[in-house]
Structures are given as structure tokens and as C-alpha cells.
């Protein structure tokens, strides 16, 4: 999964 910072850039899926 992607870190919160990467999620903002459109990386998926995001970690929780």
C-alpha cells in the first residue's frame, strides 16, 4: 500500500 504522502499524489491503494 501507499503512504499518506503518496496517496495525495494518486497512489493506490492507500495504507490505513
Curated annotation (Swiss-Prot):
Subcellular location, record wording: Secreted
Tissue specificity remark: Expressed by the venom duct.
Modified residues (4-hydroxyproline): 13
Keyword Secreted attached: yes
Disulfide bonds: 1-15, 2-11, 7-14
Domain notes: The cysteine framework is III (CC-C-C-CC).
Family as reported in the entry's similarity comment: Belongs to the conotoxin M superfamily.
Identification of the protein by name: Conotoxin mr3c
Taxonomic lineage: Eukaryota, Metazoa, Spiralia, Lophotrochozoa, Mollusca
